[in-house]
Amino acid sequence: MCLDDFTHTRRDILKLSAMLTAAGALPMLASLQARAAAEPDAPVRIGYLPITDATPLLVAHNNGLFEAEGIKAERPVLLRSWAQVIEAFISGQVNVIHLLSPMTVWARYGSKVPAKVVAWNHVGGSGLTVAPGIREVKQLGGQSVAIPFWYSIHNVVVQQLFRDNGLQPVTRPVNSPLAANEVNLVVMPPSDMPPALATQRIAGYIVAEPFNALAEDLKVGRVQRFTGDMWRNHACCVVFMHEHDLNNRPEWSQKVVNAIVKAQLWTRDNREQAAKLLAKDGDNRYTPHSSQVLQRVLAPAATERTGYENDGAIQHANWDEQRIDFQPYPFPSYTEALVTRLKHTLIQGDNAFLADLDPAHVAQDLVDDRFVKNSIASVGGLKAFGLPESFTRTEEFGF
């Protein structure tokens, strides 16, 4: 990563931190209100990052599922950073996004963005990738590990993993001296992580796919643990929509969620085809990734799973987790556990608002599940996604 890229990254991080404050969001919220008034029947406008987290949104567009529901959808907008995603969403340039689940907590309660989670976009789909010579988590002591953002499931999970292995997460300037039991967390764009690992600027990173698969493909890193093997069937990115659409356009909102739920179901049954349509040589060129790397995530060979079990990347084989999977229901127990863990996670910047959050209240207030429940029922219930017919569950951890 060149200096200009690094400066741009820091600028994006600072910009995102400024936007997700009540004062910083005000100008964009004014723009959102103006756009809503000027275009009350706006089409589906998706904003996304080129990661497999976005799969259902892109499949829904590619397969014409929005049109099949009777609503118009523009070509999804490829964005380059979470700062761009948030800015486009808060200002109303896009109206359907996938967003890191902890970022939705920050957006709604830290900056008062009037938006809600309407569904999960996927489960799992992330991993901790380390340098080839590292075989144990404890070996990361005294080194730096990259995360995509402070408000991410990656940050929450990796800090617990470190503590369980006798390591202390810290946040220090680059090249600062570290104690043998300290791990320095640095925020880095996913696309910069494999090169940084290859040049030994970092000892590892935890991030969404396909950047773990890419490190394997380039032979610059190995997967130490999959996040879904530490927090069973955890949400990573969720579907976030504006409250004014949910309240003023409920039929439209229902059709949006219907299309996304059907896209998830289609992807579960057509994993290889999904990898091809997302690839850089697909008709819509949604991502810059090769079909080979995406296949490794969406449709891995059975022999790869055996290798991960032998290496310890998978330690709970009985959970039968996919590398990435898809089910749309936002279980309240997950949101409660997430908020509880965020309170005890090292987060750089102003996070005082977390102290006053009641996990049970957030689970009810942040999420609007009326649409996704209807959508799930229309495709055969939760059993269509391989789940018991219950909208409650118990969170399972295995760090």
Regions found by a protein language model. Give the residues of each.
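Conserved C-terminal helix/tail region of periplasmic/extracytoplasmic solute-binding proteins
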Residues: 335-399
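Secondary-structure end/capping motifs
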Residues: 249-357
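Short helix-capping/linker segments at secondary-structure and domain boundaries
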Residues: 25-28, 64-67, 167-169, 344-354
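Pocket-lining segment of extracytoplasmic ligand-binding domains
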Residues: 101-103, 190-299
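Short, glycine-/small- and polar/acidic-enriched structural segments
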Residues: 37-188, 196-216, 220-233, 369, ...
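N-terminal secretory signal peptides
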Residues: 1-12, 21-23, 27, 32
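Short, locally clustered residues in the helix-turn-helix/winged-helix DNA-binding domain
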Residues: 18
